C-alpha cells in the first residue's frame, strides 16, 4: 500500500499527497518552494495564496472523488483503466482492502493524460516497447467482456504488460491505448518516452467485433468536420484490428 506520493508538475514537485488511515482520507500539502512560484493548479479549491495554502487540502467523501481532493481525482483511471487495474491487482494477489486511491495514482505514475505526475511509480517502464496491435486488441476485447474473470495465459504476459502500460491512463469506458507510430516505417511503440524521433502519438480506440463502434465514431467525426468543427485528426486504418486512431500531441 502506498502512503505518500510526490505530485509533479512540469518536472517540479508541487506537493505531497498522503493517506490518513484513521480518517480513510487523503490530504495534499503544497511544497513551500512551489508556493513561491505562484502556480495555481486549483485556484478555487487549493489556492496558492493566503492562509489556505498553508493548510492541508483533504480528500472529498463523494464517491466520484474516491477520497481524493477534487483537483487530483481527475487523474484516476477511468472505467477501462480501472478494469485493467483490477485485473492487475488480482494477478498480484493484493487484497482489495489494502488498496487506496494513492495506489491507483502510483499505478498511473507519469502516464496520466494531464500534466500531473505521481511518484513513486508502480509498473514503471522507461522504454518505448514495440507493440503487436492485433494481440493487444484481442486481449483488450476479452478483458472488456470477461472483466475480472479473464484468465491471462503465461504466453500472454508480455501482451498484458503492454496493455497495462498503454491502456490504464486513457479515459473513458471503452478499451483504448496511447501509442506512438513511426511516420516512415509504421512501427508501433508504447508512449512511455516523450519526443520519439519520427513518431506521432495517437489514442487507439479499440473496436468491437460484435458492434461497429469504431466505424460509428468515425462517421460522427466526419460529420463534425463537415459542420466546421475543428478536431484532432482521426483515421480508421483497416490494419489496426478494428480500431480508430485520434492524433495526440503526446506528453
Task: Give short role names for the model-derived ranges.
Residues 1-251:
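Phosphate/dinucleotide-binding and metal-coordinating scaffold of catalytic cores
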